[in-house]
């Protein structure tokens, strides 16, 4: 949110644009936790179906975030940088709800791999 307005994600998608999401400092937010940022965005964009929005936000925080920073990362793929977080297991009964459950219930990684190293 900036000036009490949110980015119009429907318009962004309609125009074929990509967006990324991250944290930028405590001067403009109350937390540097990316999961808090994702949760805030999940609540701020009420005009988009929650599961669809959750998937969009995870892509914005991973693949599209890496692309915005010109990093060869952001997805699990041969040749990409192996930056991976391992999180507590979730009891997700419906696999289509995995993205929303991750955003709602994740606090921090249990293990992180940067460049393939713990």
Where are these regions (language model features)?
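Helical hairpin unit composed of two closely spaced alpha helices linked by a short loop
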Residues: 2-3
């Amino acid at each position: 949110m900036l000036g009490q307005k949110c980015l119009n994600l429907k318009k962004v998608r309609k125009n074929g644009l990509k967006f990324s999401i991250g944290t930028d400092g405590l001067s403009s937010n109350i937390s540097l936790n990316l999961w808090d940022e994702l949760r805030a965005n999940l609540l701020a964009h009420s005009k988009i179906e929650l599961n669809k929005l959750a998937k969009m936000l995870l892509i914005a925080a991973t693949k599209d975030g890496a692309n915005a920073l010109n990093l060869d990362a952001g997805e699990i793929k041969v040749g990409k940088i192996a930056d991976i977080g391992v999180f507590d297991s979730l009891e997700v009964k419906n696999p289509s709800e995995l993205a929303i459950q991750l955003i709602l219930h994740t606090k921090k990684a249990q293990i992180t791999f940067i460049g393939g190293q713990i």
